[in-house]
């Protein structure tokens, strides 16, 4: 059972990478402003370096071994099946619940801009997105890229509108002076990473990409550069025009910047357009998260970590059972507080980064002659630096609430139990065959 190659090129890969992340540029990042603008800016540059280096490393691995399992495949190659499985389940859980959180944010934007939302809208969004993915990767990718382009245009509109109103004085308040402190940077990191997180999950498309040795690296590098430029401009112009106090606690910081009392005139129409753009951005991220999560679980089942039936594909080459499982998890996640979900995603994915970067270093060491159509710039040095940054991100997440940490721990226990159950059910028929009289 294999996935179809469907004419997916580097532009689709770049679109997938941007779409996976773009919602984080509309919401979530601004909570880091509570640590002060300078500390948030430094935290953003640190996680940008992490994201770029990580993208180079996983692009090398994906080009060498295109696989729908993405990160877990490389961890399995380096450290064995159990480690690979746990990384795969960690990534799957983060992406699946992130799909539900994206539905929650879309509902919130829709209620604010259009006047309706709630659970029925979340349910409809999840059903439509899973339905489109069931039609095959080609149609899903085209819609995903279109939604991503619309959301990027919305951000450009925000920046063009706010840039003339920029004032350095708006970047600070008496309570939040323009001072730099290690603790302030550390506190801002879990929020700064929302400007880039999950871009590395584009490797899930490598099995369906034409010429992955060329298109995966080119697409991933393009995605990170687009996101970096966008993130820095948002941090400078949105905060510098709307004011740090006004944006720090807003659920919709770009919309809040356009309606800030600090602006010399009203931009109500532009704010409405940007609100709609934010919905498209979240929709693009929701598409991307559902895509990557379904491929992750499909690959785990196909490799025998989970029951084989989960790796079934429909007549259009889409993994239908994994998509429906992602949809079910997303429905339940959409009922949870979104910030708790988002912070659980950061903790889980940063843990997977640590393992995959260690896997990159190990594979460079023990398999130096493995064919590598693309080689990461800086090699093991880049991976080691990113490994240190990943540990920093992971440690920063432990300033968060106990309930979220307990939930992540419970999920890991479930993942181990699921693998043990799968191994027992697959071993039982084999044992039964050995005990039949005909085989004695």
Placement of each model-derived feature along the sequence:
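Membrane-interface "cap" regions at the ends of multi-pass membrane proteins
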Residues: 1-40, 51-56, 68, 176, ...
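Helix-loop-helix junctions that connect adjacent transmembrane segments
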Residues: 3, 40-41, 116-117, 146-275
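Transmembrane helix-loop boundary segments of multi-pass membrane transporters
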Residues: 30-41, 104-119, 138-148, 273-280, ...
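TM-loop-TM module centered on a large, flexible mid-protein loop between adjacent transmembrane helices
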Residues: 73-76, 80, 111-113, 219-289, ...
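Select transmembrane alpha-helical segments in multipass membrane proteins
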Residues: 7-17, 80-93, 121-125, 179-192, ...
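Hydrophobic transmembrane alpha-helices that form the core helical bundles
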Residues: 31-34, 53-126, 130-134, 279-299, ...
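Membrane-interface loop-to-helix entry segments
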Residues: 107, 118-168, 179-180, 220-225, ...
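C-terminal membrane-solvent junction of multi-pass transporters and transport-like membrane proteins
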Residues: 9, 310-318, 353-402, 440
